[in-house]
């Protein structure tokens, strides 16, 4: 990013299993500081320490966004599947209304960047039943298949 171009990390408010990547959506981010803070303000998006969810970024744009994916919205067997993390495991979302809500959350996140974005899909961890590689690999492969470049 150049000059005054703003960048930051955005995630689904349901992305509970990004904590091993130091992303905890349960920590409340102040959108005023995140969007308006200067480059020397540790609360600003520039520091890439605090993330914003679809609630904090709706209606606002960044020049550059890093969208960090989680296992709540997965591409598998040629369709998008929706999950909610409850207790110690992912559970299938059954209600159509909640499925649509999650899909729209990711739509908001994917439309926040004016100039460009990076989509981060974690590798997963075979030793963590909540972050198995298969929760992420098919989404990652789908993005590559539709032409999103790997960097």
Task: Please tell me what each predicted stretch does.
Residues 1-81, 110:
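Conserved helicase/translocase motor-coupling segment
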Residues 47-151:
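C-terminal accessory regions
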